[in-house]
Amino acid sequence: MTDEDYPTDDPAVVTCGLPYPTGDLHIGHLRTYVSGDAFSRALRKLGQETVFVSGTDMHGTPIAVQAIEAGVGPLDLGLERHEQYADTFEEFSVAFDTYGHTDEETNVELTREFVGAWEDNDHVYETEIQVAYDPDADQWLPDRYVEGTCPYCGEHARGDECDEGCQRHLEPGEIEAPVSTITGNSAEYHERAHKFLRLSDFQEYLEGFINRMEGTNNAKNQPREWIEGGLEDFCITRDLDWGIDYPGEGGDDLVLYVWVDAPIEYVAATKQYSERVGTEEFDWASVWKDGDGEIIHVIGRDIIQHHTVFWPSMLAGADYAEPRAVCATGFVNIDGRGLSTSKNRAIWAAEYLDAGFHPDLLRYYLATASGFERDVNFSWAEFAQRVNTELADAVGNFAYRALLFANRNFDGTPQEVSLTDDVETEIAQAMDDYEDALNEYDLRTAGERAVALARFGNEYIQHNEPWNLDSEAAAPVMRDCVQLVKAVAVLLQPFLPEKTETLWAQLGEDGRVSDATIADCLQAPPAEFGEPAELFEKIEDDRVTELDEALAAKIEAASSEDADGEGMADETADDGIELEPLAEDDISFEEFQALDLRVGEVVEAEGIEGADDLARLEVDIGHEVRQIVAGIKQLHDLDALPGTRVVVVANMEPSELFGVESNGMVLAAGEDADLLTTHEDSEPGTKVM
């Protein structure tokens, strides 16, 4: 691993978090995989040798529980879903170099080697712990076989993770008020011998690693409290029939915890790729063992702890190389509300395709709607608006009018004229901005820069009006325009892989745009090409209305089913809220204007010692960074707040709470202190009207 900018001389391995084979894929899943794919393609554009891998997470309690319910074996169910996922990824042009699964022999053998190395290096020990047990079912209750209350934040939690609250990993025996998911009865805690990875051995290492690690701010900031607060050792075994048997002594009736073998699949998938192409072409060991490579993990933000605490320790304990970067994507909301599979407030991958839209349109939307770490809001109206204005009007309109005019008047690219200095400078600047954005792990800006180049082209052709010029005067204008189209095709390829191949062919280029690098943006286009076709169709308002009505109908159907007692409990239920009555006294517009509401960005968040509910926030409001006290300590994961855009009352009188001065107020809704955020990315300091 180096600290040089991309592209480096060493190869890169980009990974995506492994999906559990427990249900169909929706756009919340696709956001991570599309982002990982687009980033991999973009690195290749820079000339960075890149391998892109992932796989299906076959083991653990989620698949075991579903297999029992379906009356099939977990392997059969897992393999069926694995094939479905592979097909879906292919449909959306998520092109893994290897997409394996954790039950393959390569991963099983590597996992055994990892555990053996930990034992050889004295990082593993056995101890008695409290484990949940269901006396009625006569069964141990690992992970998702038990639910209860998170001991850290008090939210409802699964046995191994506080998925609804603070997102912490939970060790066996930690969950309070345990309930068996098998019988619904209260569980008991019994002592049981289990194996632990001694994370405390890696305390000093992790403190250094988290400072070296690149990636998104949430991935870099969230683990600091866990690491700096002292690490608890990691239970690596479970009482379960499904999984990889513990390979060492004293673990005959135990399997490895799913979060042991799951990330090792990154290594296994890379090794499988290396074996397929030959080690002379790509040597997996030089990257993963020798450190001669750039390892980049693209994950959902709910598994940050696993990838910034557990996984680096696992690698270090087996003498493997560390990751260079962890990029954690935010969630996807639907119409401004949390995606909920049980309420069917979701857009499923198959449902999107059935609606007749090209996969590239959703790829572009998900990869460029916000920065990596921020939540994306999906609505059919916003989807249509972005397709129509950014793709159809900006990219498609420019490409079509430029290539059509060039074809009809010059049979292709005008010859005997050179690219003008101004346009060459504009393209070169776009290339530099694109490269800078990727080195900041900023896909959104990279995509925006490509679309901005198309907008520049539209303005350029409109300003120069080649249709009003004679052939000699029009030639340099169209030479510039065709070059701009080529540059746009190259830069947008990571986001629109199929559509840009079509555009590349319309340009008369040989080969594929996927093989082009950023340097090709300034290489002369072919002298001849045919008449183009339009790349994008606009989405009409009537179609948006149809889609909105269909979404509302399926949500209503799921709600009715739930009311009848047939649906699942919803983790994001929002029914039955008792609203506060509206204020009886009106205020004047002048009174409202007295409030100075500003967009702010949380820079730092920490609990106030001695206060149950109060947190100290450092909030950037554009003009300055303000210290603000907010009653959100128990209601939000403070480590995840940096980078969040909030609305601040900037002209509140200063006050002092628990000895801490507060210079403003952060607006939040309801008893859960739901922080008010901006729909788009308004800059800190923007006035809220």
From Swiss-Prot:
GO terms for molecular function: ATP binding; metal ion binding; methionine-tRNA ligase activity; tRNA binding. It is found in: Cytoplasm. Its cofactor is Zn(2+). A motif ('KMSKS' region) lies at residues 338-342. Residues 591-689 form the tRNA-binding domain. Binds 1 zinc ion per subunit. Homodimer. SUPFAM superfamilies: Anticodon-binding domain of a subclass of class I aminoacyl-tRNA synthetases, Methionyl-tRNA synthetase (MetRS), Zn-domain, Nucleic acid-binding proteins, Nucleotidylyl transferase. Zn(2+) binds at residues 150, 153, 162, 166. It comes from Halobacterium salinarum (strain ATCC 700922 / JCM 11081 / NRC-1) (Halobacterium halobium). Is required not only for elongation of protein synthesis but also for the initiation of all mRNA translation through initiator tRNA(fMet) aminoacylation. It is an enzyme of class 6 (ligase). InterPro entries: aa-tRNA-synth_I_CS (IPR001412), Anticodon_Met (IPR041872), Met-tRNA-synth_bsu_C (IPR004495), Met-tRNA_ligase_1 (IPR023458), Met-tRNA_synth (IPR014758), Methionyl/Leucyl_tRNA_Synth (IPR015413), MetRS_core (IPR033911), MetRS_Zn (IPR029038). Keywords: Aminoacyl-tRNA synthetase, ATP-binding, Cytoplasm, Ligase, Metal-binding, Nucleotide-binding, Protein biosynthesis, RNA-binding, tRNA-binding, Zinc. GO terms for cellular component: aminoacyl-tRNA synthetase multienzyme complex; cytosol. One of its GO terms (biological process) is methionyl-tRNA aminoacylation. It catalyses: tRNA(Met) + L-methionine + ATP = L-methionyl-tRNA(Met) + AMP + diphosphate. This is Methionine--tRNA ligase. ATP binds at residue 341. A motif ('HIGH' region) lies at residues 19-29. Its EC number is 6.1.1.10. Belongs to the class-I aminoacyl-tRNA synthetase family. MetG type 1 subfamily.
